[in-house]
């Protein structure tokens, strides 16, 4: 057991709620903002002004939301370059196969693929082949297996929240504001 702990420490694989729930998710939000949200704003500006070039530009940005989120997650997890660049493919597949729940699928799958890629990185003389292969096979394989169910589950949670909001709008509003306030205090260093 000590050997495994030493190996994980050497590879900077820190399994913790803070690392995945705060660091990785916070970085993922930045990746989402830098692609999907900004792309949507640019596309909307193009539609409102009739400038097709802005509509196209916004479309390109939104299309890259999965890769942007996965790379941001990899950056937060201190991935070496070959792992980080391989996460582009992982993010694309997880987001595409995750449907409406793509961001949640990207978060879960990119974390697993990143940590597996970090584990094998620089362990062989053919690292340039092994590291991307492991990262992509793990990430795309998981995307094929679990991205759609994660997306469906996320959609069901969204449906439940909308139903609850219709039933008790005041209570749900208070919960939403309280959660946002709590997250702002937890991530104060990221504000």
Predicted regions and their residues:
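Membrane interface segments of multi-pass transport proteins and intramembrane proteases
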Residues: 121-126, 158-166
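Membrane-interface helix termini and inter-helical loops of multi-pass transporters
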Residues: 48-53, 150-163
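Early transmembrane hairpin of solute transport permeases
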Residues: 3-135, 139-143
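Conserved small/polar residues in nucleotide/adenosyl-binding loops
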Residues: 180-190
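Alpha-helical transmembrane segments
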Residues: 143-150
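Alpha-helical transmembrane segments and immediately membrane-proximal extracytoplasmic
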Residues: 172-173
């Amino acid at each position: 057991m000590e050997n495994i702990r030493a190996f994980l420490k050497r590879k900077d694989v820190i399994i913790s709620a803070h690392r995945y729930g705060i660091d990785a998710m916070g970085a993922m939000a930045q990746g989402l903002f830098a692609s999907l949200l900004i792309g949507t704003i640019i596309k909307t500006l193009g539609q409102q002004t009739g400038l097709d070039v802005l509509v196209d530009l916004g479309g390109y940005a939104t299309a890259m939301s999965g890769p942007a989120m996965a790379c941001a997650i990899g950056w937060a997890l201190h991935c070496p370059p070959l792992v980080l660049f391989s996460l582009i493919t992982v993010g694309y597949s997880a987001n595409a196969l995750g449907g409406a729940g793509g961001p949640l699928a990207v978060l879960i799958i990119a974390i697993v693929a990143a940590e597996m890629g970090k584990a094998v990185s620089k362990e062989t003389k053919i690292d340039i082949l092994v590291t991307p292969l492991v990262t992509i096979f793990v990430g795309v394989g998981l995307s094929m297996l679990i991205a759609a169910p994660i997306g469906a589950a996320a959609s069901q949670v969204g449906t439940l929240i909308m139903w609850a909001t219709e039933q008790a709008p005041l209570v749900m509003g208070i919960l939403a504001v309280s959660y946002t306030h709590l997250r702002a205090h937890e991530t104060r260093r990221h504000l």
